[in-house]
Amino acid sequence: YDLADYVVFAASNSGSTKEAISLLDQLTKAGHKNLFGLTAREETTLASYANETFVLKCGWEQAVAATKSVAEQALFYQELVAQLQGESILSQLPALGDAIEKALTIEIDPEVTKAIAGAGTIYFAGRNDGVGEELALKTNEITRKKSDFLEGTYAVHGIEEVMDADDVVVVINPFEAELEKLKETLVDGVGLTIVTISTAESIFPGIVIPDAGSLQNYVDLAAGWNILIEVGISLGIDLDKAERARKVGNEFTTD
């Protein structure tokens, strides 16, 4: 990509992610002047390659599975874009906080937890807005299970051929018109379990969460964390410490 005329932001909680630092290093050597960093702690390697670095207020997370920092990163960029349009999301944050707390603490049906804990593969289906993709990654780190993200209506376009009855598909805010097709293809056809994260009841088991309007993605993400935490606890897993995954997956070194 030719980024010569772009303002470039590099986000790295640790401030030592190799890909981000390598990119800023290349752009600096090419004379690029508009380079900005976003990290979760002060005095990082990334900051030395950026013209200015912003630091999240949530603090550094020790757990391998980053959660609150993921949300604050997204909020930072959403507010930045809003301000460029002469707007702001700051007034919506108190209500968003309440909605997230409810999504994190709502009781999960034990049968839902049991089904997901026993799944061979946990799939997330929905819009490509980052929520399903992020939860698929967190599934690996928190539950030690295989996962995948099925974008849009991918779930009803052939993947059922390789699915198993012990798999679970978590559908995030599905369109009502899609529910019967999902049931026909995956529940009736494969015999697997579908769970929904939604602002309204559906024909499937799941959790109903508050409607946060344009900030709904954060509530969806929190609801997914809630489910994964319950599954991890039920499996006796140390939620904060993965057996193989590292806090900084691909760390920059000077060697």
Language model features with spans:
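Residues at alpha-helix termini
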Residues: K29, E141, G189, I233-S234
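Short secondary-structure boundary micro-motifs
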Residues: G37, R144-K145, S214-L215
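Residue-level detector of functional hotspots within protein domains
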Residues: L38-T39, I108, E133, Y154-A155, ...
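Active-site phosphate/pyrophosphate-binding segments
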Residues: E52-V168, G236-D255
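Glycine-rich phosphate-binding loops that contact phosphosugars or nucleotide phosphates
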Residues: Y1-E101, E160, V168-P210
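Phosphate-moiety recognition in structured ligand-binding domains
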Residues: A50, F175, T185, G191-D255
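Terminal peptide-recognition signature
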Residues: F9, T139, I227
